[in-house]
Amino acid sequence: TDALCDSIPIVVITGQVPTHLIGNDAFQECDTVGITRPCTKHNYLVKNIDDLPRVLHEAFHIAASGRPGPVVVDIPKDIQFAKGSYSRPNEFPHRGYKPKLDGDPNRIRQAVELMARAKRPLFYTGGGVVNSGPKACALLRELVKLTGFPITSTLMGLGAYQASDPQWLGMLGMHGTWEANW
């Protein structure tokens, strides 16, 4: 759960009973996919050795792209011991994973209207800005300058906005500044 909440890209490889025993309440069987679904970005149960190279490449891609997060790859015992051939996939498009990268103009307009009506506006930023790269940090600086709103950040967002700027209140939280937490 921490890795998902903190946007930590991690691939976790777990073991499972042999494929023919899955769903039979076998000794040491665990519904890893079901248990980890709420706290992972994506998860896999590999039932064919030939799928393993593609699944591993997809898992690392999904863990590190978009909003980073944990991905679980559950490998049954018979697949762990199976022999297969490895060939790097040319492409590994994941049909079910397509993060939306463009902003929705209507939602942006609504956000601007809310900001204009706010009585005590404040930018509360986090690690998503840092993970989005230098362009996002530059756009954040431009937005703060344009609006004149004060800005604060979580621990994971430190560095996205310069601490020497007069609009900067400091970091939020238990170890943050009094101003940011007020």
What are these regions (language model features)?
Residues 1-182:
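N-terminal alpha/beta PP-like core and its mobile active-site loop of ThDP/TPP-dependent enzymes
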